[in-house]
Amino acid sequence: MARIAGVNIPDNKHAVISLTYIFGVGRTTAQKILEAVGIAPSTKVSQLDDTQLDAIRAQVAEYMTEGDLRREVSMNIKRLVDLGCYRGIRHRRNLPVRGQNTKNNARTRKGPTRPLKR
């Protein structure tokens, strides 16, 4: 297994799919990385040599991935909560942030139902 950005990349998959195992790298970003390096997206990771893997590592290093990206996202949410703005309040109460209705749905965000005490 190749190791890129601190993540073990599966050898038996295509390079495009394998790169998506890195947090912050989706299909589009993976295709851009492989295009910049000059590797066909359908190439298996096991067929790549060390120089190609080093080139991929250099390209991935230009993006914010893994721990840095997670920290950035959590700091953005913390900033909204500290400001006390509408979005921050919704984050604090574990409710949907982007305007979805909560009368009937939003069970994923609200958590399991609580029984009524009569």
From Swiss-Prot:
Disulfide bonds: none annotated. Residues 93-118 are annotated as: Disordered. Residues 106-118 have a biased composition (Basic residues). The keyword tRNA-binding applies. GO terms for cellular component: cytosol; small ribosomal subunit. Keywords: Ribonucleoprotein, Ribosomal protein, RNA-binding, rRNA-binding, tRNA-binding. GO terms for biological process: translation. The keyword tRNA-binding applies. GO terms for molecular function: rRNA binding; structural constituent of ribosome; tRNA binding. It comes from the Bacteria. Pfam families: Ribosomal_S13. Located at the top of the head of the 30S subunit, it contacts several helices of the 16S rRNA. In the 70S ribosome it contacts the 23S rRNA (bridge B1a) and protein L5 of the 50S subunit (bridge B1b), connecting the 2 subunits; these bridges are implicated in subunit movement. Contacts the tRNAs in the A and P-sites. Belongs to the universal ribosomal protein uS13 family. Part of the 30S ribosomal subunit. Forms a loose heterodimer with protein S19. Forms two bridges to the 50S subunit in the 70S ribosome. This is Small ribosomal subunit protein uS13. It comes from Psychrobacter cryohalolentis (strain ATCC BAA-1226 / DSM 17306 / VKM B-2378 / K5).
